[in-house]
From Swiss-Prot:
Native organism: Aspergillus clavatus (strain ATCC 1007 / CBS 513.65 / DSM 816 / NCTC 3887 / NRRL 1 / QM 1276 / 107)
Chain sites annotated for binding heme: 438
Entry protein name: Cytochrome P450 monooxygenase ccsD
Top-level EC class: oxidoreductase
The UniProt record lists the keyword Oxidoreductase: yes
One example of a Gene Ontology biological process annotation: secondary metabolic process
Lineage of source species: Eukaryota, Fungi, Dikarya, Ascomycota, Pezizomycotina
Keywords: Glycoprotein, Iron, Membrane, Metal-binding, Monooxygenase, Oxidoreductase, Transmembrane, Transmembrane helix
UniProt family annotation: Belongs to the cytochrome P450 family.
Functional description taken from the UniProt entry: Cytochrome P450 monooxygenase; part of the gene cluster that mediates the biosynthesis of a family of the mycotoxins cytochalasins E and K. The hybrid PKS-NRPS synthetase ccsA and the enoyl reductase ccsC are responsible for fusion of phenylalanine with an octaketide backbone and subsequent release of the stable tetramic acid precursor. The polyketide synthase module (PKS) of the PKS-NRPS ccsA is responsible for the synthesis of the octaketide backbone. The downstream nonribosomal peptide synthetase (NRPS) amidates the carboxyl end of the octaketide with a phenylalanine.
Glycosylation site positions: 445, 477
Domain of life according to the entry: Eukaryota
Compartment(s) of residence: Membrane
Length: 494
């Protein structure tokens, strides 16, 4: 007589079957790579050492870089222009960021065409008119976060720069009232942090269990989004009502010096009827806050680190500010007049990029470039940006910080419009390039220059005696995590 299956066994079988169904229905299907593509692999959670080895072994051809979590087909810098010309329907940057940040749970990579056009065109157009208002927002942010320091005061840089940028940008996007609301600022700061932690948890979890664990891992992300939705809804309802009642909507979109940037009106004017629901606008605001805050904060963090390491630069930069500013006000432009500051910022950006890579793309179709085999759909491709930023053939003493590097290069006849912080190209990989370049780089440029100008005018900055330069940590997706222990000494000048 056959023994009956116990209820406990049945439950165990049911759970196992459910896990298998979830796993096979949601797992990432890895593309089959061509055999002639060399592989550089290491039992490591990051790409740093893998890239160094790959660059040495295969300087002029692509290779497959494999760490414990991701596989990227890495192309040499010579392929930069080829990759930037690949259309989005063949090779997508949005899909890359969606994949790396679990976009189905976080919204990342869900940027709509109207949102991107709003950032590229409408937001960029209003930046010059907003400079002096954003100077006021910057003063408010620094006074509330750093404050007056009659004696040398140690400031932890990571969270300080994060909060400063979050406040400055929030005042522009959602207005001073909500932008100074600690609940909103905290939610903006929490957004990338809870996503990062959730992705780390998922990466460490066995693949079979990830579908089951995801709702729990991303619960803090969802709760943070609910908080942002609750705070945004009254403002958006008011904005939508004003837009609906206004006959001359071009007046709403006209660049103005005061008030918040009319981001809601910009979005409503670009969405088709029925698309611009309040839910869609909430997602757009969450995304623009996520996309604009951590990367700009990281750049400001490194700028302060370099200023602390090179305090002699401060007087040179202050003299330039004195020549450009009138009654304490910066010009209402994209601030290209600040040529030495621009050079300082670009040099910091060169030495301290966000990622080891540039032009990261997920392929929707097979792609064959001038070197290497055909790469199948589903693969992630990228350019070795570190090989550009630290190239001895491009830059003299590439591992050294030279605040005048790009200022001096622009003095060469024919270079007047080259080597700016905002420039994209094969010698400036930080913003990406082509039709999928960073759409918010003009806004980031403005934020950085206004914040840096405030620091130079109001504080002396130096390293703490005996401290070491910040130590960056490479992450699984190729990005760098700033040193959370880095600090600088601030002292008020007046």
């Amino acid at each position: 007589m056959v023994n009956e299956i116990s209820p406990r066994t049945l439950v165990l079988l049911a759970v196992t079957c459910s896990l298998l169904v979830l796993y096979f229905s949601t797992r990432e299907r890895q593309p089959v790579m061509p055999r002639e593509l060399p592989v550089v692999k290491a039992k490591s959670y990051h790409f740093e050492d893998i890239i160094v080895e790959g660059r040495k072994k295969y300087p002029d051809r692509p290779y497959l870089a494999v760490n414990n979590r991701h596989s990227f087909v890495v192309y040499p810098p010579s392929c930069f222009d080829e990759i930037k010309r690949l259309p989005e329907h063949s090779a997508s940057a949005k899909d890359f960021f969606h994949t790396m940040n679990a976009g189905d749970w976080t919204y990342v990579g869900h940027e709509t065409t109207p949102l991107l056009k709003t950032i590229i065109a409408d937001l960029t157009r209003v930046i010059p008119a907003r400079v002096n208002k954003r100077q006021q927002d910057t003063r408010m942010a620094f006074e509330s976060i750093v404050g007056y320091a009659p004696e040398w005061k140690e400031i932890g840089l990571l969270m300080t720069t994060f909060e400063i940028v979050a406040k400055i940008n929030a005042c522009a996007f959602v207005g001073r009232e909500l932008g100074t609301n600690n609940k909103w600022v905290k939610a903006v700061m929490q957004s990338p942090l809870v996503i990062h932690v959730a992705v780390l948890i998922m990466n460490a979890c066995p693949a079979l269990l990830r579908p089951l664990l995801a709702p729990l891992a991303f619960l803090p992300t969802k709760m943070n989004q609910w908080d942002m939705r609750r705070l945004l809804t009254p403002m958006l309802q008011e904005d939508m009502a004003i837009f609906k009642e206004t006959k001359d909507r071009s007046e709403l979109l006209r660049p103005k010096q005061n008030g918040k940037i009319p981001l809601t009106a910009m979005l409503l004017s670009r969405y088709k009827q029925g698309e611009a629901t309040i839910r869609q606008l909430i997602v757009d605001y969450i995304l623009i806050s996520f996309d604009s805050t951590p990367s700009t904060a990281s750049a400001l963090y490194h700028v302060i680190c370099e200023l602390a390491a090179h305090p002699e630069a401060a007087d040179v930069l202050r003299q330039e500010l004195d020549e450009v500013m009138v009654d304490g006000k910066l010009p209402q432009t994209h601030l290209q007049e600040l040529k030495r500051m621009d050079s300082f910022l670009r040099e910091s950006f060169r030495l301290h990029p966000v990622s080891l890579f540039s032009l990261q793309r997920v392929l929707a179709k097979p792609v064959k470039l001038s070197v290497g085999p055909t790469i199948p759909a589903g693969a992630i491709i990228a350019v070795d940006a570190a090989a550009i930023n630290r190239s001895p053939s491009l830059w003299k003493d590439p591992d050294e910080f030279d605040m005048n590097r790009f200022h001096d290069l622009r003095q060469v006849p024919g270079n007047e419009n080259k080597f700016h912080l905002l420039n994209t190209g094969s010698d400036s990989p930080g913003w990406g390039d082509g039709t999928q370049a960073c759409p918010g780089r003009f806004f980031a440029n403005s934020t950085l220059k206004i914040a840096f100008a405030y620091i130079l005018q109001n504080y002396d900055v130096k390293r703490k005696e005996g401290s070491s330069p910040p130590k960056m940590t490479p992450l699984a997706n190729g990005t760098w995590a700033p040193d959370d222990k880095a600090a600088a000494l601030f002292k008020s000048r007046n």
